[in-house]
């Protein structure tokens, strides 16, 4: 807040809870800049409510599917995001989910808390040995994916990836393949692609059917990339071994079918929730606002 105050503009500060649509339109009216998070849906109507003085919308996130970027561009409003500063925190959480799902950590915790009598056995809650030659497949190969790949290589995993810019070859121990090959060959499939019209429900029933029955799915990208109904069906039928989700198609609502699904680890969109990381995201968002309001190019413009 101090950094924003230094700009010499009046501030309107929201509360901890996401604003309603009417509150958002009220608060953004007459603003020259808006710092928002993924809970705020900035569409053409909200932009119109802001008025002609709005110059920049700084999204405190890498993904920006909550903002109508085309409508903003039409109105001459710069949209920015916060890439880079959250790569390691998100990669850490992604790998934590890989281990939690594949080694059945949450299942074990729930089992003990249930109070059931138990006796240790050599085949109790067997999971995937990720460091015994398991293959990690990464859908989408941006900065966060590269950070996940580095962690996977430290666990001696074989890493496959898909990329819009290349479909074959190797780079830093990562082999690039097409999506079908990746799905069929991977022991863990990690979704790290942005949500676009082309990637919505990229992981559908057909994609899940291509995966090994022993494989796990992890999504820390955007909820809409995975068809949640198809995932529930696959888990319930045992067509894949398990999954872990940090993001959901209709946040903050989580489909009750997901809550009831077996072998599924869920976290509430907290992959970047390291204290230092969140501070850095906020600072970068404010730096983008400061740049635009002082006539300089935005540091992280979204196009």
Which residues does each PLM region occupy?
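C-terminal helix-to-coil terminal segments
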Residues: 73, 80-92, 251-303
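Glycine-rich Rossmann-fold phosphate-binding loop(s) that bind the pyrophosphate
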Residues: 141-142
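N-terminal Rossmann-fold NAD(P) dinucleotide-binding loop
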Residues: 145-146
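Phosphate-binding beta-alpha-beta segment of Rossmann-like dinucleotide-binding domains, i.e.
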Residues: 75, 83-135, 150
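Phosphate-coordination loops involved in phosphoryl transfer and adenosine-cofactor binding
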Residues: 54, 132-135, 205, 214
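Short beta->alpha connector loops at strand-helix junctions that form conserved
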Residues: 13-16, 60-61, 77-88, 163, ...
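An N-terminal-biased, well-structured beta-alpha scaffold segment characteristic
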Residues: 1-80, 184, 204
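Rossmann-like adenosine-cofactor binding region
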Residues: 29, 42-46, 160, 164-257
């Amino acid at each position: 807040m101090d950094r924003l105050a230094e700009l010499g503009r009046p501030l309107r500060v929201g509360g901890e809870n996401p604003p309603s649509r009417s509150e958002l339109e009220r608060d953004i009216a007459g603003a020259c800049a808006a710092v928002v998070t993924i809970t705020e849906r900035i569409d053409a109507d909200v932009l119109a409510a802001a008025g002609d003085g709005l110059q920049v919308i700084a999204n405190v996130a890498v993904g920006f599917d909550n903002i109508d970027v085309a409508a903003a561009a039409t109105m001459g409003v710069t949209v920015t995001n916060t890439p880079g500063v959250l790569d390691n925190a998100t990669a850490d959480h992604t790998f934590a989910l890989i281990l939690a799902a594949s080694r059945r950590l949450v299942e074990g915790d729930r089992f003990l808390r249930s109070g059931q009598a138990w006796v240790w056995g050599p085949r109790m809650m067997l999971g995937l040995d990720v460091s015994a030659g398991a293959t990690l497949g990464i859908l989408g190969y941006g900065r966060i994916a590269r950070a996940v790949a580095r962690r996977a290589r430290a666990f001696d995993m074989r890493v496959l990836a898909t990329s819009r810019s290349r479909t074959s070859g190797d780079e830093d121990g990562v082999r690039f393949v097409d999506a079908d090959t990746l799905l069929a060959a991977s022991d863990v499939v990690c979704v790290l692609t942005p949500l676009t019209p082309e990637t919505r429900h990229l992981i559908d029933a057909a994609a899940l059917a291509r995966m090994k029955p022993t494989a796990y799915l992890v999504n820390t990208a955007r909820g809409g990339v995975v068809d949640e109904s198809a995932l529930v069906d696959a888990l319930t039928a045992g067509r894949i071994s398990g999954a872990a989700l940090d993001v959901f198609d209709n946040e903050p609502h989580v489909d009750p079918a997901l809550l009831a699904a077996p072998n599924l680890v869920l976290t509430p969109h907290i992959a970047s929730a390291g204290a230092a990381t969140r501070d850095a995201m906020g600072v970068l968002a404010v730096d983008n606002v400061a740049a635009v309001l002082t006539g300089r190019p935005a540091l992280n413009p979204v196009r």
